[in-house]
Every structure is written in C-alpha cells, then in structure tokens.
Amino acid sequence: MIERKEYMNLLEKWRDKKAIKVVTGIRRCGKSSLLRMFREKLLSDGVSEEQVQDLNFEDLDNEPFLNYKFLYAHVKQNLCPDKMNYLFFDEIQMVENFQKVIDSLFLLDNVDIYVTGSNAYLLSGEIATLLTGRYIEIKLFPFSFREFMQTQPAHTSRELAYRQYIELGSFPYIPQISQDREMVREYLSGLYNTIVLKDVVSRKKITDVMMLQSVVRFLTDNIGNISVIKRISDTMTSLGRKTTSHTIENYVSALTDSYIFYPVQRYDAKGKQLLKTGQKLYLADVGLRQVINGTKGGDLGHVLENIVYLELARRGGEIYVGKAGDAEIGTPCVMFY
C-alpha cells in the first residue's frame, strides 16, 4: 500500500486537536485506505484497540447504525472513559441526521473524530453551519504522478509511466490492473456509473439521465474552456435536447457535489476581484475521459492543464483562472493567503 505522506502528515498534525477531520473526495480515491493507514499508525504508537471505533456505512454489517440514535448509543457505550477515543466514520453522509451524532460526540473531551464522504452534502447548507469552526477539510485526490511512480516496477521509465498516467488515470486500484486495458475500462466505467447513478441521479432525483450524460460529455469535451451555463443550455437545445439554464445549473452543481468535476472561478488579477461569469471545470481524474467520451485521443494541452490543476489542488491554496488586464490567464494558478 502506498503511504500517502502529505495526507498522513495532515492527519498527524491535527491528531488529538479539537477539530473534526473531514476527508472528502471522489469515490475510490483512497479515503478508506487513508484512514486505515492512520488507524494502523495509531496502534503502532501505542493506542489500544479498545480506543478505536471504525464504522464503514457502506458495509451491510453496519446497516443498523444508519439510524442515528442506534449509532450514537453504540459509540457512546463503547467509549473508554479515561482515555482518548479515536472514531472513524466512513461515508457517514449515508446516516440520516448524522450531524446530530457528530455534534453530540464532539462535546466530549475524550474523542477525536475522523469522517469521510464522497459527496459535498457532507459539508452543505445547515450541516456546514452547524459544524462551522469545528472541522477541517482534507481534500483527497487520486494518486499524484509521484505516488503513481511508486506503484511502478523499478525499471519503468518516467516517460512510459507518464503516458500511462495520462491515459489510464490515477485511481489507486488502476496500477494493479494496468496490464489489462479492458479491465481498466470496465473498472472506470463501473466507477463512473456508480457516481452518476448513486451520487448524482439518486441524491438529486434527476429524471432525465440522458440529458445529464450529455452534459457530462460536453463538460469533458470542454475541459480547459470557460464554461457558461447558458452556452451549455443552448448547445443541448441545438442538439435536439431542449432544456433551461436553471436545469443545467442544477446538473453542474450535482456533478461538482459528487467530486467528479471541480469548479475553478475566474479572477481579475489586476482588479483584484472575482469575475461574475464563467468558470472552468476539471475532472477529478483524467482517466475518466476514456469512459465518458470514448478512446479518442488529442487535446493533450487541456489534459495537461487538468493535471496541473489537480497538482495545485493537492498542494492547497486558492486556485483561480481569469485575466490580468486584457490578457487571459488560461492555466490554473494558485494564490496563498
């Protein structure tokens, strides 16, 4: 298993601090594995098994705990009263009213809480308000190229590895099946369908799945271009799929909530203000292009721009595209405060 050093260091930095550690990111980017590695580190540091509670809410064995009252009672009953307790909740957004559990447990002095989520619902609206000042978000992405290289045989050239990185993407499971391109495609296709059907269609109650798929293909085709909601709506209408800007806006919002796309706002560097129109959208992993739009090649410049965005996002800071005077800033840039 690849040690994701930067993320492990972040978790260690916030260990035992009075803040809920929220790990977010697209499905299968390694959130569960990261918490598993951190759990193992705690045990190697002398923390006892009794001090650790670990619940994955996608596991059928834990279905009774989807009821928040049962969950709270179970966790509370198993706390060590005179020691620090480490609580790991994987995909906790599946628990209705989960925020009540987290809020109540947070009031205790001897708990350190870690949660993961594959949907921005975890930190949306009233929930974000409730948890304001009580959490830190750790945004997890699929492997960086440096991490990807650690999965390759020692004799692999960087050039060959980078071609694979661009073509196949960097979800942590990909290196294990990279020799069989059909398996890679099936894996990515299954992952993509799960995200669209489970995290987008079901949660947002979208009825026109074909329209949603068309929007995803359009956004993927236009990685690196400024996306304007009205232009997307007009394009769909011109293709015989009449829709409204409001519908398209909801679809784009649902897609970014599922972390399959990340939005980047435009910024006027000279005027030092955000621009009100347009944004760029980048895929969470460039390998998804092959199952969304087929295996067509080309457009390497925008693929590399997407990879630049992901690397900047891993390193933190506020990321913008935009302009400086009349000059367009096409590549993502990062601003630290």
Q: What residue spans do the PLM features occupy?
A:
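Accessory nucleic acid-recognition modules appended to NTPase machines
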Residues: R181-F336
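Short glycine-rich substrate-engagement loop in P-loop NTPases that contacts/grips substrate
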Residues: Q53-N85
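Conserved catalytic/switch belt of AAA+ P-loop NTPases
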Residues: Q99-V115, N119-A120, A128-L130
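Pre-Walker A adenine-sensing motif
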Residues: I2-D16
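Hydrophobic anchor at the beta1->P-loop junction of P-loop NTPases
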Residues: V23
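Interdomain motor-coupling "hinge/lid" segment immediately C-terminal to the ATP-binding subdomain
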Residues: S118-A120, G125-I226
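Conserved lysine of the Walker
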Residues: K31
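Hydrophobic positions on the alpha1 helix immediately C-terminal to the Walker A/P-loop
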Residues: L34, F38
